[in-house]
Amino acid sequence: MVQCVRHFVLPRLKKDAGLPFFFPLITHSQPLNRGAFFCLGVRR
């Protein structure tokens, strides 16, 4: 659940900072990596 909640905040940051900010974030946290891609698939 926390992963999905974070993913809701990330798209807003991604629009401001761009992919360079979003990419290193998921790269450093592997658990969030799965959660982010899972939520991304559910959202789209």
Swiss-Prot record:
<dbReference type="InterPro" id="IPR012602">
    <property type="entry name" value="PyrBI_leader"/>
</dbReference>
<protein>
    <recommendedName>
        <fullName>pyr operon leader peptide</fullName>
    </recommendedName>
</protein>
<dbReference type="GO" id="GO:0006221">
    <property type="term" value="P:pyrimidine nucleotide biosynthetic process"/>
</dbReference>
<dbReference type="GO" id="GO:0019856">
    <property type="term" value="P:pyrimidine nucleobase biosynthetic process"/>
</dbReference>
<keyword id="KW-0665">Pyrimidine biosynthesis</keyword>
<dbReference type="Pfam" id="PF08052">
    <property type="entry name" value="PyrBI_leader"/>
</dbReference>
<keyword id="KW-0428">Leader peptide</keyword>
